[in-house]
């Protein structure tokens, strides 16, 4: 019997902060399981989850507004430690008898807080000392409102000149509030504070580790599917690859992977996927060459969203046809990860907007009554990668830059043609190869090449040529919500440009995209 890795668990209530998922990832990094729920949960749901502790996230609302979100009152009656972050601290203060006011000055960015009273949350944690020996902490603030009176049974733990209650605590009830964000790296001791809360105050053991997660996933897959057969759409991306490896470990030859080669992959990618999973790891793979079918469906279509939908639809059609050829398949596996689950929940509550549609195996034939196996649905992307390493997948594959589901279909601007894809594949391979050679690949968050359907005059030897243009794109980002264009060295860009123009017959000009996000998106389509 595998160990219960969910035994100790933290509940994070989401009040809408852009950093909330980061809080959850930090708790997981400490080896403790946690879940992220909307703030308006019921007492019954909290009782059922039975958390070892509760974290109240930050949020964009103002607690001074009449209908702003509040923590369920049961949070403060459950008898477990509670940690309020930013908005979470303000709603805690207000709900327990303190007072919050809108401030004239918004405090955003670096601040230094002075610890004025002892507390289990920050005992022995400091960045510097004042002249009279008081601990100082370097933190990241982001708030407009501030607590002006703490509840009567709380003490002030730390303050700044403009924020008299930067940390408050009720040690007896183990309630803590901080007016800054411990989850961001700018708060230098933030991880130690979270560790103090999760591991010491909530007394959670570090049971959530890659090896134990794998054992748990394998046991759950076996329990769910037994001796039944399972089908998986394998793309070669991180999520489907790790899903394939987990299922292979759990059920061996009862897994069939369908690899649809849509003609929109990177250079030699199809061969690499088949070699690695088929020849090296011994998975049972059905290879479906479908380039002509995808390109025919895309012919004449210029609209990016329409292209995404076509690629998604044709993939489902091809996958369904292959699934129908297999006998006795009872289960469909998918590489759904935890942020997908959170996104779906947000959509259900009307709190998320779709900027670009994502495609997955969306529909299965009505006659196929299949169950769903989603072994990664509790995991964040960084956890999926760590598990992949533990399962023996190569680092370069797990940590390569994101590649869109529709592939080159949205990196060829406008109509997608085989000629354009072939040129783009070769140009992109040169860019990535040079990034790796210059030790720049891991210093940027994402880099790729875009095919522009415009011709430009060039000179080759004594002759003129009139060929296509490609754009190089490289960005630096923490969360992909915002991004800066990467300041790559000019001599490096010159080398890449020369190689592409000289080695890829059909491209006459290379440009570099210097747009940030916002206003531009990272992908061009």
From Swiss-Prot:
Catalysed reaction equations from the record? XMP + L-glutamine + ATP + H2O = GMP + L-glutamate + AMP + diphosphate + 2 H(+)
Q: In which pathway does it act?
A: Purine metabolism; GMP biosynthesis; GMP from XMP (L-Gln route): step 1/1
What species does this protein belong to? Escherichia coli (strain K12)
Q: In what residue span(s) does the Glutamine amidotransferase type-1 domain sit?
A: 9-207
Tell me what this protein is called: GMP synthase [glutamine-hydrolyzing]
**Gene3D superfamilies in the record:** 3.30.300.10, 3.40.50.880, HUPs
Concerning what turns on (or off) its expression, the entry says: Activated by cAMP receptor protein (CRP). Repressed by DnaA.
Relate the assembly described in the record: Homodimer.
**Domain GMPS ATP-PPase as annotated: residue spans:** 208-400
- EC annotation from Swiss-Prot or TrEMBL: 6.3.5.2
List the NCBIfam families.
Answer: guaA_Cterm, guaA_Nterm, PRK00074.1
Gene coding for it:
guaA
- Please name the GO terms that the record assigns under molecular function: ATP binding; GMP synthase (glutamine-hydrolyzing) activity; GMP synthase activity; identical protein binding
| Positions annotated as active site in the UniProt record | 86, 181, 183
Name the UniProt key words of this record, in alphabetical order: ATP-binding, Glutamine amidotransferase, GMP biosynthesis, Ligase, Nucleotide-binding, Purine biosynthesis
Q: Which GO terms describe its biological process?
A: GMP biosynthetic process
Question: What's the superkingdom here?
Answer: Bacteria
**What task does this protein carry out?**
Catalyzes the synthesis of GMP from XMP.
Annotated residues for binding of ATP: 235-241
| An example Gene Ontology CC term for this record | cytosol
Keyword match Transferase: no
Instruction: Describe activity control.
Output: Inhibited by 2-fluoroinosine 5'-monophosphate (F-IMP) and by N(2)-hydroxyguanosine 5'-monophosphate (N(2)-OH-GMP).
């Amino acid at each position: 019997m595998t160990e219960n890795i969910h035994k100790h668990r933290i509940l994070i209530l989401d009040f809408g902060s852009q950093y909330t998922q980061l809080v959850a990832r930090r708790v997981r990094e400490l080896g403790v399981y946690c879940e992220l729920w909307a703030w308006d949960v019921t007492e019954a749901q909290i009782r059922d989850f039975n958390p070892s502790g509760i974290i109240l996230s930050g949020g964009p609302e103002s607690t001074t507004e009449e209908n702003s979100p509040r923590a369920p009152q049961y949070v403060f009656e459950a008898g477990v430690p509670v940690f309020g972050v930013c908005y979470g601290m303000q709603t805690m203060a207000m709900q327990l008898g303190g007072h919050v006011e809108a401030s004239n000055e918004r405090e955003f960015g670096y601040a230094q807080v002075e610890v004025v009273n002892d507390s289990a949350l920050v005992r022995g944690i400091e960045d510097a000392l004042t002249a009279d020996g008081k601990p100082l902490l370097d933190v990241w603030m982001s708030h407009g409102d501030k607590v002006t009176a703490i509840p009567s049974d709380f003490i002030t733990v730390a303050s700044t000149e403009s924020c008299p209650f930067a940390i408050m605590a009720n040690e007896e009830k183990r309630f803590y509030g901080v007016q800054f964000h411990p989850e961001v790296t700018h708060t230098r001791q933030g991880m130690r504070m979270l560790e103090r809360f999760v591991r010491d105050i909530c007394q959670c053991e570090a049971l959530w580790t890659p090896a134990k997660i794998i054992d748990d996933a394998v046991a759950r897959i076996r329990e769910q599917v037994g001796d039944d057969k399972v089908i998986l759409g394998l793309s070669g991306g991180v999520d489907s690859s790790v899903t394939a490896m987990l299922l292979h470990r759990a059920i061996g030859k009862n897994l069939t992977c369908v690899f649809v080669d849509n003609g929109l992959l990177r250079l030699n990618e199809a061969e690499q996927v088949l070699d690695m999973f088929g020849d090296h790891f011994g998975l049972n793979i059905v290879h479906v060459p479908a380039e002509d079918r995808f390109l025919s469906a895309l012919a004449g279509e210029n609209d990016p969203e329409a292209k995404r939908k076509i690629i998604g639809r044709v993939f489902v059609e091809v996958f369904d046809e292959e699934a129908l050829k297999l006998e006795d398949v009872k289960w469909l596996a998918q590489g759904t990860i935890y942020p997908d689950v959170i996104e779906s929940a947000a959509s259900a509550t009307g709190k998320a907007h779709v900027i670009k549609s994502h495609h997955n195996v969306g529909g299965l034939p009505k006659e196929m009554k299949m169950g769903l196996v989603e072994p990664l649905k509790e995991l964040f992307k960084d956890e999926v990668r760590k598990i992949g390493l533990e399962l023996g997948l190569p680092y370069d594959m797990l940590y390569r830059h994101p590649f869109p589901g529709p592939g080159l279909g949205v990196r060829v601007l406008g109509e997608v043609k085989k000629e354009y894809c072939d040129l783009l594949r070769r140009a992109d391979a040169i860019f990535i190869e040079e990034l790796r050679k210059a030790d720049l690949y891991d210093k940027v968050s994402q880099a790729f090449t875009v095919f522009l359907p415009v011709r430009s005059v060039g000179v080759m030897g004594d002759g003129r040529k009139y060929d296509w243009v490609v754009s190089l794109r490289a960005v630096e980002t923490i969360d992909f919500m915002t991004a800066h264009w990467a300041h790559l060295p000019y001599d490096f860009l010159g080398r890449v440009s020369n190689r592409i123009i000289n080695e890829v017959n059909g491209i006459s000009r290379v440009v570099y995209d210097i747009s940030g996000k916002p206003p531009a998106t990272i992908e061009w389509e």
